[in-house]
């Protein structure tokens, strides 16, 4: 496998009014008990390390975390196996695991965004967008959607404010379910502090997919992966409505994606 440093990169140019961060951070404290609970999770460590000895951690039968990624020899890249598999949580191995960092094939998102991404002015979306300078294979990791981690109360306030002032909205809500029951909600806002993930626009027929990835913290990272092979110069987009599009809310803005199946409006996941 190529050295992770040859494939990944996180020194992208960004506008000055945004603090560039490498991974999600806690929102400023508002002193609420809701914030304290979020902070507790943020500061916790997942204690479910694998006990593999020098293996590749590829297989769920041998590694408690494995089975979600596969190494594509042709592209010399680790990729997410099948999108349907994400019904099972993606948990990467970490420094506390028994495996070796050099041979483990269950570490991807933790190495940061891929190289050859470019922020550009998208004429279709009449604002910034993100595109790739080179071909990206299906399942490849693009980047994290990193920003401030918000409480539900703070997210509702910011959404309302964005709506009232007609600002662009960067708040993303990801619900995780188990047996149809909602287990956890993760809300990320890269409007003030964020990474390159903040430039992906919404499409009703997207070429990227967003999934929850845990490394060593109970709060997942929001990982953006290629939903299909993506050609050089293609703009990267994902569906803002997330996992259950029947529950999408209408953000009140016309969608500019121009896909054949476009609903005509920009969605977001509802916050309950
Ligand atoms: C996460 S930001 C994406 C990056 C943004 N275009 C920029 O210039 O920074 C989300 C905002 O981009 C715009 N946007 C994204 N997808 C869109 C779409 N399909 N149709 C219309 N506007 C879109 C909306 O203003 C939305 O609030």
Model-derived segments and spans:
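Alpha-helical interaction segments
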Residues: 10, 189, 228-230
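Accessory low-complexity/Zn-finger-associated flanking regions
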Residues: 1-127, 254, 259-272
């Amino acid at each position: 496998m190529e050295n992770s440093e040859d494939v990944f990169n996180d020194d992208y140019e960004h506008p000055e009014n945004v603090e560039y961060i490498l991974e999600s951070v806690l929102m400023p404290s508002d002193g609420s008990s809701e914030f304290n609970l979020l902070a507790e999770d943020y500061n916790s460590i997942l204690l479910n390390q694998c006990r593999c000895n020098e293996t590749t951690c590829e297989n769920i039968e041998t590694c408690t975390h494995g089975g979600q990624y596969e190494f594509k020899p042709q592209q010399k890249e680790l990729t997410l196996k099948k999108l349907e598999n994400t019904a099972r949580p993606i948990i990467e191995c970490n420094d506390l695991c028994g495996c070796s960092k050099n041979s483990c094939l269950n570490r991807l998102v933790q190495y940061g965004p891929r190289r050859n991404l470019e922020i550009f002015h998208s004429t279709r979306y009449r604002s910034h967008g993100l595109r790739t300078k080179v071909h990206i294979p299906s399942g490849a990791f693009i980047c994290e959607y990193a920003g401030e981690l918000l409480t539900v109360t703070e997210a509702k306030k910011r959404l309302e404010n964005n709506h009232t002032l007609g600002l662009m909205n960067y708040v993303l809500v990801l619900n995780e379910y188990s047996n149809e029951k909602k287990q956890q909600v993760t809300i990320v806002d890269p409007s003030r502090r964020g990474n390159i993930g903040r430039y992906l626009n919404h499409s009703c027929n997207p070429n990227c997919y967003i999934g929850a990835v845990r490394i060593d913290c109970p709060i997942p990272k929001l990982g953006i992966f290629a939903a299909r092979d993506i050609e050089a110069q293609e703009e990267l987009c994902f569906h803002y409505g997330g996992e259950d599009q029947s529950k999408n809310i209408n953000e009140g803005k016309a969608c500019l994606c121009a896909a054949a199946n476009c609903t005509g409006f920009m969605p977001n996941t509802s916050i309950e």
